[in-house]
Amino acid sequence: MRYLLYFFLILGIHNAQVTGLNGWDLFIDPGHSQDENMGINGYSEAKEVLQVGLELMDILNSQSDIDTVYISRTNDNQSVSLYQRTNYANTVGASWFHSIHSDASSNTNTNRTLLLWGQRNNGNPDPPVGGEEMSSFMIDILTQGMRIGTTDSWGDCSFYTWSDYCANSGGPYLYVNRNTNMPSELSEEGHHTNPAQNQLVMNAEYKRMLAYLFFWSILDYHGINRPFVG
């Protein structure tokens, strides 16, 4: 499959700890709950992104000196509201918030990546800033690693032009961007309505590859060299 080269490279990574994240922590938010947003082949967005989030948590804890990794849910039985997610992140005072999702479309041929960062209605990033820059790393690495097209990285108010929510409220548009006290962004890792993509994400190694793409994005954002591959 197309992702095998990336997975074999991942297998060659030495498990030496990456340094440079000490004092920084991350709140991972696997979107939705239980079996929500069913994929075209019967594998839901909620189950997919939970496993990617847990893999990312494991990679960060085992391969870096990151201070703490938090996660909004840990199993497929939990039902977690948007308020519970953001309130948890704010209560623990996380340095960063990242929400993992997959996208949906009525066109089953569509399969693209997307990053959405918090934006005010005036076009400026929502403070505290950082989501826009992190998204610029994530969108490139995620798209290249998945080898699919992209809708690019957008401020959420600029993306949801069909809604007048930002004009009336000032923004951001997305709840998780609007109600977190730290820099944040939301990723869409392809479309679960695309048959080939929904089949790929059933594979545990593919989900771990997606987690590595987020890990590498975080390292690149911090200017930290990626682990040696070979």
Name what the model sees in each region.
Residues 67-69, 149, 184:
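Hydrophobic anchor at the start of a short beta-strand
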Residues 3-14:
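Sec-dependent N-terminal signal peptides
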Residues 54-66, 90-94, 102, 139-148, ...:
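Sec-exported extracytoplasmic/periplasmic mature domains
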Residues 27, 34, 99-107, 154-229:
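Active-site-adjacent mobile loop/cap segments within catalytic or ligand-binding domains
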Residues 49, 60, 89, 138, ...:
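Structural element of the ATP-grasp superfamily
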Residues 131-169:
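Active-site-adjacent substrate-binding region
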